[in-house]
């Protein structure tokens, strides 16, 4: 290399290192439902400016709120509203809530069950499956196969919302559950890998030809029904900060809820505000 080329390369790398060191880091953690959205938003946001760099990890809604309350994350991702006990535990500062999109919990079954004719379910039927009172698909006019019910782990916002809206309480026992999945992606893998499973997922995970999305209480889980509230298992997705956001955290939040960020949401299978 010529001396001039070498000097230019040194200057270039010095500039890159300087930019990297100067960028304020924003850590986002929590809900696995929100995770793919936040990752896509962060990738676009990070590529548009150099002052703030956002990193995203999962862990579940409860873990994200804990991380924010303990000062380990600037932003918590949540698929449910913060609870009174969480507010009380970290009462030194007030949590700030930011709506970032709509979502619906979709009831999904293995493709062979769907293809055999199980295409809808009622709240009562679903509750009885997870309570262990309905145990075979033939009881729902399906094939003679045991029902393999999948639930989310403790601390999951999706689990809490499902238990509250379907089972009647977030703390309810669900003896019909055969396995507990650590995250939305794991639920989808378990359902698609079985010929007799049922589970619940956020809307963005429930698309695809490798599983069957059930009509719930006579209502299809689509964008229109989720946004207008007619789909019974509709909800909002949130960002939370513990106290006032840092400048870069606020900048990222503003991007996500702004027109560019909402476009990213729609392009990645989420339901914009």
Locations of the language-model features?
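Bacterial N-terminal signal peptides that target proteins for export
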Residues: 1-8
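Exported/periplasmic ABC-transporter solute-binding proteins
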Residues: 22-273
């Amino acid at each position: 290399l010529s001396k001039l080329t070498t000097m230019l390369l040194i200057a270039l790398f010095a500039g890159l290192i300087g930019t990297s060191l100067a960028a304020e880091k924003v850590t986002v953690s929590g809900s696995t439902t929100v995770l793919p959205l936040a990752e896509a938003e962060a990738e676009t946001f990070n590529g548009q400016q150099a002052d703030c760099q956002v990193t995203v990890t999962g862990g579940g809604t409860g873990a994200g709120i804990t991380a924010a309350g303990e000062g380990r994350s600037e932003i918590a991702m949540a698929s449910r509203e913060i609870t009174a006990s969480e507010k009380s535990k970290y009462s030194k500062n007030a949590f700030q809530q930011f709506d970032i999109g709509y979502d619906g919990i979709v009831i999904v079954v293995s493709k062979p069950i769907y293809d055999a004719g199980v295409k809808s379910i009622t709240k009562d039927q679903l509750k009885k499956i997870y309570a262990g009172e309905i145990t075979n698909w033939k009881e729902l006019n399906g094939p003679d196969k045991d029902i393999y019910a999948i639930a989310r782990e403790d601390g999951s916002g999706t689990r809490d919302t499902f238990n509250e809206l379907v089972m009647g309480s977030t703390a309810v026992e669900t003896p019909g559950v055969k396995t507990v999945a650590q995250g939305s992606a794991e639920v989808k893998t378990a359902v698609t890998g079985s010929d007799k499973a049922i589970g619940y997922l956020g809307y963005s995970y429930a698309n695809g030809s490798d599983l069957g999305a059930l009509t719930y209480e006579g209502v299809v889980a689509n964008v229109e029904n989720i946004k207008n509230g007619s789909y019974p298992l509709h909800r909002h997705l949130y960002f939370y900060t513990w106290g006032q956001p840092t400048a870069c955290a606020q900048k990222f939040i503003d991007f996500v809820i702004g027109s560019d960020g909402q476009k990213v949401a729609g392009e990645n299978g989420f339901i914009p505000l």
